[in-house]
Amino acid sequence: MNRRLLLSAGVAIAAAVAGGYTFMGRKAPAPAAGPAGGGDPVADLMQLQLPDLAGASHSLAGWKGQPIVVNFWATWCAPCVREMPELDALQKKYPDIRFVGIGVDSAANIQKFVEKVQVSYPLWVIGAGAIDTLRKLGNPAGGLPFTIVFNADGSINRKILGEIQPDDLDKTLSGLKA
């Protein structure tokens, strides 16, 4: 059976089991309404307040005017884990581009994970309730990993479902203007 299909099925089952709840039984944060209240998924993502591993809240809106690479991942996702060192190397190569890993997992699992595998870019937690967010952003299966490259003006440059190809992503990043 196709590995991507298996991964997507696993994510869908996890989402169904989680029922929209994140770590410690809290309801997943609801995305803010878009500028006109129309539910623009990119605007919603930019405004979404997400905790880092220390519990401090952040949003992508804080990086307005800068190119951003957002990587949705999970500790249990083998392709996600494989691509993290490659994303870390690209982040170091392009210091003017903001990178963030948004964990579709619990803060406790991510904390244990980073004790073994460290990255230099920030990791935020969205929890299992993220599947809806992923779908709205153009990932109908809600599969992981899922990477979105944003231009400095906040528009989407490209979406990558599945493991990144470092040389391919490098070409995209080299063309971004800060």
Model-derived regions: residue spans:
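Structural microenvironment flanking redox-active thiols in thiol-disulfide oxidoreductases
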Residues: V81-Q118, A128-L134
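Short, ordered coil/turn segments that flank beta-strands lining enzyme active or ligand-binding pockets
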Residues: L53, W63, A152
